[in-house]
UniProtKB/Swiss-Prot annotation:
Substrate binds at S414. Residues 209-344, 345-485 form the KARI C-terminal knotted domain. Binds 2 magnesium ions per subunit. This is Ketol-acid reductoisomerase (NADP(+)). It comes from the Bacteria. The gene is ilvC. Keywords: Amino-acid biosynthesis, Branched-chain amino acid biosynthesis, Magnesium, Metal-binding, NADP, Oxidoreductase, Repeat. GO terms for biological process: isoleucine biosynthetic process; L-valine biosynthetic process. One of its GO terms (cellular component) is cytosol. Belongs to the ketol-acid reductoisomerase family. Pathway: Amino-acid biosynthesis; L-isoleucine biosynthesis; L-isoleucine from 2-oxobutanoate: step 2/4; Amino-acid biosynthesis; L-valine biosynthesis; L-valine from pyruvate: step 2/4.
Length: 492
């Protein structure tokens, strides 16, 4: 199989990278009706598989779970989760032939084996669904021409998908139809119904493409969403301890600081996050972020280039074939890091202290979000897609760090995201150690910035630069559709 994106000519590549349309709410007046009366069979009962299934069932759809025979016989966690929630469970052979829609929600590295197992069992004219297009775009999986191939990609972890639905809302969602597999022209109608069944239509849906979703998703998770959190956590902890800060305090400030400070992004973008700082701290955070952007731009561009060409995917798939030797080695190395093994801090840290003592962390978040967005849009990805794959998801991933530090983040994200995260962090950490961390000042991390004289013109210009960044402009519009989403819990 050949990388699908690389089989396209330049015009086709640009067209698919740039496909992005915010859909109006009146396009979903029929909600999930088109799928009612059809049997929907989900393969995979992880966080996305279970929670999407629960939402779809509550929306009136007929949902069952197809699992491997061994998973059923051995009563593995996937079988237990499905049966404990009252779903019908069966083997591929029992359930797939009757399905109008088969939804593949297994991990990326299992997709080829799963799709090759279920394709011969799917009835003529059925549909195959994904929530991430890696198998189609990067692996180049060939699907039978009578099968419609669609994607519904919620831009949140599975638990959020469920919780927002239970509140009568939903999470922002990308939908797409594979242009090589829409024989009856019903792909978009099917995708809209599936998105509505998960509640996504209440929070905003982007009509995208498999290509745009995959390339932007890979870029976001490798750089700002996971890689920057990993690199920033390791660097900031080591810096504070070297400066004499109690390791327990440093560990807590970082573990919960990402979550607390980036919560402001969800409510009001980079503007609000920076507005939580004093004027002196804001000016310092802005200056640090500009230095970071200049240093890291080539690294962000390298990741984007490797994603576009397929070099990243081919390297990762080679590691799959080699038993995940690199991935598992990097995971073990992270587990041995001083930050992961820092003692617990029993004292309380106020919400504002996370901002006041975390100026460098805020600068890192700002620089990473803006660089990821800028790099994606310069590569042909539309601003709305770039926003969802950078700023929007950052507080959600930061929330996983708050649970059990980097271990939890790397458990929750996909193996694909974890592999890319390590690639980025392994390059970013030595780069910033050598060229940046040694130039920090007192007040950048672990202590507040001292108040000083403020130049009104300078403050005016910085405020204007923050507010007029393109991600702030598109973000203000998109957040308008998400204003009812619940606030992520902030530690104290």
């Amino acid at each position: 199989m050949a990388n699908y994106f690389n089989t396209l000519n330049l015009r086709q590549q640009l067209a698919q990278l740039g496909k992005c349309r915010f859909m109006s709410r009146d396009e979903f007046v029929d909600e999930a009706d088109y799928l009612k009366g059809k049997k929907v069979v989900i393969i995979g009962c992880g966080a996305q598989g279970l929670n999407q299934g629960l939402n779809m069932r509550d929306s009136g759809l007929d949902i069952a779970y197809a699992l491997r025979k061994e998973a059923i016989a051995e009563k593995r966690p996937s079988w237990r989760k499905a049966t404990e929630n009252g779903f019908r469970v069966g083997t591929y052979e029992e359930l797939v032939p009757e399905a109008g829609l088969v939804v593949n929600l297994t991990p990326d590295k299992q997709h080829s084996a799963v799709v090759q197992a279920v394709q011969p069992l799917m009835k003529q004219g059925a549909a195959l669904g994904y929530s991430h297009g890696f198998n189609i775009v990067e692996v180049g999986e060939q699907i039978r021409h009578d099968i419609t191939v669609i994607m519904v990609a919620p831009k949140c972890p599975g638990t959020e998908v469920r919780e927002e639905y239970k509140r009568g809302f939903g999470v922002p969602t990308l939908i797409a139809v594979h242009p090589e597999n829409d024989p009856k022209g019903e792909g978009m109608t099917l995708a809209k119904a599936w998105a509505a069944a998960t509640g996504g239509h209440r929070a905003g849906v982007l009509e995208s493409s498999f290509v745009a979703e995959v390339k932007s998703d890979l870029m976001g998770e490798q750089t700002i969403l996971c890689g920057m959190l990993q690199a920033g956590s390791l660097l900031c902890f080591d810096k504070m301890v070297a400066d004499g800060v109690d390791p327990a305090y440093a560990g807590k400030l970082i573990q919960f600081g990402w979550e607390t400070t980036t919560e402001a992004l969800k409510q009001g973008g980079i503007t609000l996050m920076m507005d939580r700082l004093s004027n002196s701290a804001k000016l310092r955070a802005y200056a640090l972020s500009e230095q970071l952007k200049q240093l890291m731009q080539p690294l962000f561009e390298k990741h984007m280039d490797d994603i576009i060409t397929g070099a990243f995917s081919s390297g990762m798939m080679a590691d799959w074939a080699n038993g995940d030797v690199k991935l598992l080695g990097w995971r073990e190395e992270t587990g041995r890091s001083p930050f992961e093994n820092a003692p617990q801090f029993d004292g309380k840290i106020s919400e504002q202290t996370y901002f006041d003592h975390g100026v460098l962390m805020i600068a890192m978040a700002k620089a990473g979000v803006e660089l990821a967005f800028e790099t994606m849009t310069r590569s042909g990805i539309i601003a709305e897609s770039a926003y969802y794959e950078s700023l929007h998801e950052l507080p959600l991933i930061a929330n996983t760090v708050a649970r059990k530090r980097l271990y939890e983040m790397n458990v929750v994200i996909s193996d694909t995201a974890e592999y890319g995260n390590y690639l980025f962090a392994n390059a970013a950490v030595p780069l910033l150690k050598e060229a940046f961390m040694g130039n920090l000042q007192v007040g950048d991390l672990g202590k507040p910035v001292a108040d000083g004289e403020i130049d009104n013109a300078r403050l005016r210009d910085v405020n204007e630069a923050i507010r007029q960044h393109p991600i702030e402009i598109v973000g203000a519009e998109l957040r308008g559709y998400m204003k009812d989403m619940k606030r992520i819990a902030v530690a104290n």
